[in-house]
Each structure stands twice: as structure tokens, then as C-alpha cells.
Amino acid sequence: MAKKSSIEKNNRRRKMTKNAAPKRARLKAIIADKDLPMEERFAATLKLAEMPRNSSATRIRNRCEITGRSRSVYRLNKLSRIAIRDLGSKGLVPGLVKSSW
């Protein structure tokens, strides 16, 4: 089980990213637009740099919804391999069958 502080920190980052996404997208579009004057693009770069680091999507870590584990997490269902195995052995994951040969 991951530390609660790590899980909460990641959740805060998700919220910040969601709130700041439109503003970041606008600033990035201004920076990428070669038709605008250089001063305006540079000002947009400075505004983007002033935004909080945690509002960037790269700072988000994929974590298991059940355990908070950060490694070996499947994006499709947001569960770690260990959680999938436990739920599968209890029969709670539809279509998951223990292999035998």
C-alpha cells in the first residue's frame, strides 16, 4: 500500500492539471504560432513558465485505484497487476480465467 500522502499529492496534481489545461493549451498555441511577433510569443513563454509545475500533465503518475501502487498499473482499468490477480481469483473481473495447461 502506498503512502496516503503520495496518493493525495497525485490527486491534487490531477485536479490542478484539469483546471489549468485550457490555459496551458492557449499559451502553447501562442508559442507555436510562427505568424505572431516574437515579443508576444516570448511573453506567452514567460506566462507558461510562471504556472505551477504540478499543473503539467507530465507530473501525474498512474496509480492503482485500490492499492495506490505506482508500478505495473494497467491503464485500461487503472489497477495494478497484484490487484487484478486478487480480484480475478475472487471472480470479480469478468472474463478473467486462471490459466492451466
UniProtKB/Swiss-Prot annotation:
Residues 11-23 have a biased composition (Basic residues). Residues 1-10 have a biased composition (Basic and acidic residues). One of its GO terms (cellular component) is cytoplasm. It holds the Pfam family Ribosomal_S14. Keywords: Ribonucleoprotein, Ribosomal protein, RNA-binding, rRNA-binding. Residues 1-23 are annotated as: Disordered. It comes from the Bacteria. InterPro entries: Ribosomal_uS14, Ribosomal_uS14_bac/plastid. Binds 16S rRNA, required for the assembly of 30S particles and may also be responsible for determining the conformation of the 16S rRNA at the A site. Part of the 30S ribosomal subunit. Contacts proteins S3 and S10. NCBIfam families: PRK08881.1. Belongs to the universal ribosomal protein uS14 family. This is Small ribosomal subunit protein uS14. It comes from Rhodopseudomonas palustris (strain BisB5). The gene is rpsN.
